From Swiss-Prot:
Protein name: Pantothenate kinase
Organism: Nocardia farcinica (strain IFM 10152)
Lineage summary: Bacteria, Bacillati, Actinomycetota, Actinomycetes, Mycobacteriales
UniProt-annotated location(s): Cytoplasm
InterPro entries reported for this sequence: P-loop_NTPase (IPR027417), PanK (IPR004566), PRK/URK (IPR006083)
Binding annotation for ATP: 95-102
Amino acid sequence: MARMSEPSPYVEFDRKQWRTLRKSTPLVLTEEELIGLRGLGEQIDLEEVAEVYLPLARLIHLQVAARQRLFAATATFLGEKHPDRQVPFVIGVAGSVAVGKSTTARVLQALLARWEHHPRVDLVTTDGFLYPTAELTRRGIMHRKGFPESYDRRKLLRFVTEVKSGAEEVCAPVYSHISYDIVPGKLHCVRQPDILIVEGLNVLQTGPRLMVSDLFDFSIYVDARIEDIEKWYVQRFLALRKTAFADPDAHFHHYASLTDEQATLAAQEIWNSTNRPNLVENILPTRPRATLVLRKDADHSINRLRLRKL
């Protein structure tokens, strides 16, 4: 554990230091399960799960228990009966496009669901709260898709508020990466989860009004050098030509036939016009708000972590 020369609300770890905090937490994922959770281009293996994610799962498990004691104390103060069900613990996972936050969220969901005290763990991405393409076009912000203003932030806030308030069922819209739009009539519903993970680009943003980040009990920022993220984005774009882009119904099907050189230029254009500006202007400035920062090296491996202790 790194010692700070100046007073700081953070404590920093290298991977060797962090892995000792796993204690006796068992590894409950198999290689086959991990393959199903791993995103395109991700290199995560069982060793990283054991050394990075198991200590994290243990920390969150301890914080879930502590948060429930806090809610019980507040109920006692108010003279209220303690609720039969625990208040859902909400985790935010933020980071750039192509940094691997979706894989982080899925692995965390799988690990946390193995703990007997919180077996119901739901994962929702903020993609479902993007405005439909027709609405983005009407507002003249289709080119700003992924920027904060392209999301229905009120709907997202209402969704998380209702989940945390104990509503029996709360439903979110579903986004398709094939059609590049909200799927009409399709919903993803959660039913009183013990833990809710909310994953998205801008989930840690703040503002003058109540924001979804104000409802998080724990938050994670997946970090890396901008140059590395750009490289991963281009690599993923090239790989998608043979998967999602190959579907004739895909919004980006016209990219499927590009040569490597053409696809690289197209990916760099999208990165420089949209993803990099969004990262620099909106996403990266929210990093200090995270409870935990996971820092990736150029090979995708997590080797440094920064935990907010205050």
